[in-house]
UniProtKB/Swiss-Prot annotation:
GO terms for molecular function: methylated histone binding. This is PWWP domain-containing protein 3. PROSITE patterns: PWWP. It comes from Schizosaccharomyces pombe (strain 972 / ATCC 24843). InterPro entries: PWWP_dom (IPR000313).
Length: 407
């Protein structure tokens, strides 16, 4: 039993040692691979990381000045000093949240148009000599070298960076098209007709005069544009018609209009049946207008838990003017819209704001008297004339009263 235990222990120890050896080998290989990757990155980015601008920092920079800005894990990048007003509000708020404002400078990276706030220690001026030094010694990537070249071109031409960028990235095909001169249409030479025995010529369908006219009338670009404009002008409807057409239309329109009849009860009964629909339509419109006036007055002056304000009184004044000048009030409209019952309540109101200015109480009472002339008991027949009610109209109340016969 002791021998078996020792053998099993030996096996376990061997397995543990083998596992340790495998782990050490993996660590060694991993370190080697990481070292080789780092060496490759250093070879690629060696020039970028080693490059430091030769210019000295300044205390302040002008807006629009070209600089070299440095962010963590990035090389020195060409940029431009931006003012806070030129940056959009959303971008400005995001920058203030993500970057520190202490001794920070607003910078716009070129040509990506990205903004950032960078400390003044990581911002250096970009001069023409420094940019030429970058290009001559190949101290950055091709992308940065191209932007530096555009900056030099903008400084020489005294133009903004965006204008130079547009000229640089303009396709060559468009330039070639612009450089090519416009070719003029060539005139075709008309050859003479062949001769036949006897001195006769072949008779063409078109004579020489017609051929010369067609050659002269050959369309050019300008003539085609003018022709298209004239065709469109002829096809499009003219905004101002001729005076003859307008005169005809006016006469025709005037003849088609029908005069509205007078809205008295006797006149309505004398009319033929064909006009009943027209009367009903007009009556419906008048009913809706008076009903709207009633709702407005009731909401302002008689609504629950609402005391009328001075700002509402001008609107009340306008509604009363509309009712006073309404020329077609009759008993049916007063009963259906319940306007008469509303004014019986309005007369009882007191302490109306701006009553001295608009004289509401007296106007309510006068309108109520006018409405009483139209309202009759159901037993009596309607003999009241529906004359128009004006603001200064005098209503004969005696006509509304029934005649009493004394014996």
């Amino acid at each position: 039993m002791m021998v078996a235990r020792t053998r099993s222990q030996k096996r376990k120890l061997e397995e543990i040692n083998n596992q340790k050896k495998i782990k050490t080998k993996k660590k060694a290989t991993g370190q080697q691979t990481s070292n080789t990757k780092n060496l490759r990155d250093v070879k690629k980015k060696g020039k970028q990381l080693a490059y430091v601008p030769r210019t000295s920092p300044r205390k302040s920079y002008k807006n629009g000045e070209y600089v070299l800005a440095k962010m963590s894990s990035f090389p020195w990048w060409p940029a431009r000093v931006a003012s806070q007003k030129s940056i959009p509000t959303e971008v400005r708020e995001r920058l203030k949240r993500n970057f520190r404002m202490d001794n920070g400078i607003f910078v716009q990276f070129l040509p990506s148009r990205d903004y950032a706030i960078i400390s003044s220690s990581n911002v250096l001026p970009l001069t023409v000599d420094e940019s030429r030094f970058i290009l001559d010694h190949d101290l950055s990537t091709k992308y940065i070298q191209k932007t530096v070249g555009l900056i030099i071109a903008s400084v020489k031409r005294k133009v903004s960076f965006s204008d130079v960028e547009e000229d640089e990235f303009e396709p060559e095909n468009t330039r070639k098209k612009l450089q090519k001169p416009i070719e003029k249409p060539k005139k075709e030479k008309i050859e003479a007709t062949p001769k036949i025995d006897g001195g006769k010529r072949l008779k063409n369908e078109k004579s020489s005069a017609e051929i010369s006219q067609t050659s002269k009338q050959r369309p050019s670009r300008r003539s085609a544009r003018v022709r298209m404009a004239t065709d469109n002008a002829q096809k499009s409807p003219s905004p101002i018609p001729s005076p003859k057409k307008t005169a005809k239309k006016r006469v025709r329109f005037a003849g088609s209009l029908e005069e509205l009849p007078k809205f008295s009860l006797e006149y309505q009964l004398a009319q033929p049946i064909s006009t009943v629909d027209m009367y009903a339509q007009v009556h419906y419109i008048r009913f809706n207008t008076l009903l709207y006036y009633r709702y407005q007055l009731q909401e302002i002056l008689l609504s629950y838990n609402h005391y009328p304000q001075e700002s509402d009184m001008s609107h009340v004044h306008q509604i009363l003017e509309m009712i006073e000048n309404f020329s077609a009030i009759n008993s049916e409209l007063l009963e259906s819209t319940k306007l008469y019952s509303l004014f019986t309540l309005l007369v009882k109101l007191s302490d109306i704001p701006l009553d001295e200015k608009y004289d509401f109480s007296s106007r309510f009472s006068t309108l109520l008297l006018q409405f009483q002339a139209f309202v009759q008991p159901k037993t009596m027949t309607s003999n009241v004339s529906t004359a128009p009610i004006g603001k200064n109209a005098q209503v004969n109340t005696e006509a509304a009263r029934p005649s009493v016969i004394t014996t």
